[in-house]
Amino acid sequence: MKLELKNLYKDFTVRNFFQKEKKSVLEDINLTLEENDILGLLGRNGAGKTTLLKIILGLIHPTKGSVIFSDKKDPLFGFANSNPRSFFWRISCKENLIFFGKMLGLTSKEIDESIDKLSDILGISDILDTPFMLLSSGQMQSINIARSLLKKPDLLLLDEPTTSLDYESSKRIIDTTKEYLKENKIPAIWCSHDHLELNRVSNKFGLLKNKRFTFSNSKIFKFHQKAINYEFEVINKDIDKIKLKLDIQITKLVNINQFFTVKDKNLDLDEFLRLLIKIDVKIISIEKNFNHFEDYIL
């Protein structure tokens, strides 16, 4: 399925005590998504990413412009964000998925087959019988994504799906979801304010900034994939392992964890992360070491 957005505008009416004001959120958005594309959409909080997804989903109407789906009159969407509140917390994950599968019109056999397939790819087999309320944030998000894929969608929309997750949980969700999309040839729009995440999963990139959408090629994203641009958090006992391999700068100490940056300007982030895995060091968090990546990209 091919998606086209043509000359899309979106305004909202903001009411205050004295008057109504028009607030422009999106202006002249033009976008083409081909079959099998995964578009990484970068933008700060409030840039309009969620608004754009809602327009594509048909939840809100654009002020002007058109949304065109070729080959599909009534496409099926998959959608996942970082909010787990739409699940039933006291029943098991499998019972949740069965309920939502029935809402999608799937038969019991189709639901079981879909859950089995998704369990293998997303690694959720061990938690299917666990009440949803007992899951970690990362596990909840895996179930959230499984729900969005229960019935193979024509287009998957992901709105900051790894927000608030630790590095390991984020990496697992990114890698498993990308594998499933590729295997099943499902196009997707993956929204985030984290360019590292988008660079791992996407073959196309775009930036929402100042109400407008701009395509960007992956080389611009990769240019900033140097370890020196990040601050890392690890537990105290792992710092000495890292010091044996690299020249680092300790930036702060919080409880039993230490934060540091690397000094090597030429060390790629991926190479650095592979080194940490090799020496058995687990990253607790990674933060960008400059103010706003969007200001550097274009």
Model-derived features: where do they sit?
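Conserved ABC ATPase signature
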Residues: P131-L135
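Helix-to-loop junction immediately C-terminal to a conserved catalytic motif
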Residues: L57
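The feature captures the beta-strand-to-loop junction immediately N-terminal to the Walker
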Residues: L42-R44
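Conserved ABC ATPase "signature" region
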Residues: I98, K102, E110-I127
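Conserved catalytic motifs of ABC-family nucleotide-binding domains
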Residues: K152
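Catalytic Walker B motif of ABC-type/P-loop ATPase nucleotide-binding domains
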Residues: L156-E160
